[in-house]
Curated annotation (Swiss-Prot):
Belongs to the FAD-dependent oxidoreductase family. The keyword Phosphoprotein applies. GO terms for cellular component: cytosol. Keywords: Cytoplasm, FAD, Flavoprotein, NAD, NADP, Oxidoreductase, Phosphoprotein, Redox-active center. The keyword Glycoprotein does not apply. PANTHER family: APOPTOSIS-INDUCING FACTOR 1, MONODEHYDROASCORBATE REDUCTASE 2-RELATED. NAD(+) binds at residues 173-179, 197, 203, 262, 315-316, 350. It comes from the Eukaryota. It holds the Pfam family Pyr_redox_2. This is Monodehydroascorbate reductase 3. Its main location: cytoplasm. Transmembrane segments: none annotated. Catalyzes the conversion of monodehydroascorbate to ascorbate, oxidizing NADH in the process. Required for producing sufficient ascorbate to maintain the interaction between Piriformospora indica and Arabidopsis in a mutualistic state.
Length: 441
């Protein structure tokens, strides 16, 4: 007979959302043996964004312990013994292969059965593979996708192997492409980025913002090829990649390829059991799903946007952390016959690479207004962009800002103050946000 365990709460997924949900349960009050985290990854929850940043910096040579949650918010790191001390069963290296939400039963890949009273789905996303978008010979050696800790470990080994002679091609011009390119270049690899869009981070950056980063990267020796895609690869006798074939007929030498062509939420386990929307699991403002006692967090959740109306699915660590806290607070409040406010999320994105660091709050819709020093040759560039819709500032981007300035732009994005004109806003620049922030304290 299969081994069976029962818990009051079960979290499926050991990523950012799972780790921060565990922290919130601990903060709210948790009895030993009430909570289990079941994760297919072999390690405790860690800050996944760091896989493309500090974790592959060979000069820093960090360990996994450096990036355990809750390092991303400056709180104490949750080492393996933290879960033991809190009475949380951390079950790693175990994948749930069957979920019957009607009977509140989960079955793992090793045949064990887990029963729960309340389930939190924090399964995150899976990378889209090159073969899924029609790229030929995409299963050769030294093509990397960064999602799990093993991915970054393997890339770091390849970076060490090819140090001083590395030729890396990054397929994709999004956030991951920017971060990985800088890490490889900082570790003395020749780097080429390839993507089909007309500029970097096309869905998010304006052409003016992208122009700065493209020039900055060019000054660092990174080559950028736009408007084409990879179609296949050449290999040596060991099956290792040697060339990337492009649609425009060019070939690029490469002994390392990193693909960042998108991701999809990992929801297949629950198909036909939960209501879905916009590619994710539909939830309310407390991250409750269409099935009682089942919650969805982070990347997999499509939730109501209180500020803007409608619903949205957000793939970002910030939302993973905050949605986890919201769900756990809602669960505990419900047990006590209390209520909490609906989730009121302000979209937030950030990135850092080389000596640059930017943050964005709000929405990138409407007319854009550039301000500040966006000279890529500047020793300390500092610039930003406001987005104005219907006479109100609805989004703000800032490169090179301070902590206080980031608070200011966040305040502006949430309050959405009116502006006299775009010209006046451009002239005021960052001072518009800092003045608004100081007067609202």
């Amino acid at each position: 007979m299969a081994e069976e365990k029962s818990y009051k709460y079960v979290i499926i997924g050991g990523g950012v959302a799972g780790g921060y949900a565990a922290r919130e349960f601990s903060n709210q009050g948790l009895k030993p043996g009430e909570l289990a985290i079941i994760s297919k990854e072999p390690v405790p929850p860690f800050e996944r964004p760091e896989l493309t940043k500090v974790y592959i910096d060979l000069e820093v040579n960090p360990t996994l312990a450096n990036i355990y949650v809750c390092a991303g918010t400056g709180e104490a790191k949750q080492y393996p013994n933290w879960y033991k001390e809190k009475g949380i069963d951390l079950i790693v290296g175990t994948e749930i292969v069957k979920a019957d939400l009607a009977s509140k039963t989960l079955v793992s890949d090793d045949g064990k059965i887990y029963k729960y009273q309340t389930l939190l789905i924090a399964t995150g996303s899976t990378n889209i593979r090159l073969s899924e978008i029609g790229v030929q010979e995409a299963d050769v050696k030294n093509i990397f996708y960064l999602r799990e800790i093993e991915d970054s470990d393997e890339l770091a080994l390849a970076m060490e192997l090819y140090v001083q002679r590395g030729k890396a091609v990054i397929i994709g011009g999004g956030f991951l492409g920017l971060e990985i390119s800088s890490a490889l270049r900082a570790n003395n690899h020749e780097v080429t980025m390839v993507f089909p869009e007309p500029w970097l981070v096309h869905r998010f950056f304006t052409a003016e913002i992208a122009s700065f980063y493209e020039s900055y990267y060019a000054n660092k020796g990174i080559k950028i090829i736009k408007g084409t895609v990879a179609t296949g690869f050449s290999t040596n006798s060991d099956g290792e990649v040697t060339e990337v074939k492009l649609e425009d007929g060019r070939t690029l030498e490469a002994n390392i390829v990193v693909a960042g062509v998108g991701a999809r939420p990992a929801t297949s386990l629950f198909k036909g059991q939960l209501e879905e929307e916009k590619g994710g699991i539909k939830t309310d403002g407390f991250f409750k799903t269409s099935v009682p006692d089942v919650y969805a967090l982070g990347d997999v959740a499509t939730f109501p946007m209180k500020m803007y109306g409608g619903t949205r699915r957000v793939e970002h660590a910030d939302n993973a952390r905050k949605s986890a806290a919201q769900a756990v607070k809602a669960i505990k409040a419900g047990e006590e016959g209390k209520t909490i406010p609906d989730y009121d999320y302000l979209p937030y994105f950030y990135s850092r690479f080389f000596k640059l660091s930017w943050e964005f709050y709000g929405e990138n819709v409407g007319e854009s207004v550039l301000f500040g020093d966006n000279d890529p040759k500047s020793p300390k560039p500092k610039f930003g962009t406001y987005w104005v819709k219907d006479g109100k500032v609805v989004g703000v981007f800032l490169e090179g800002g301070t902590q206080e300035e980031h608070k200011a732009i966040a305040k502006v994005a949430r309050a959405q103050p009116s502006v006299e004109s775009l010209d006046v806003l451009s002239e005021e620049g960052l001072s518009f946000a800092t003045k608004f922030y100081s007067t609202s304290l």
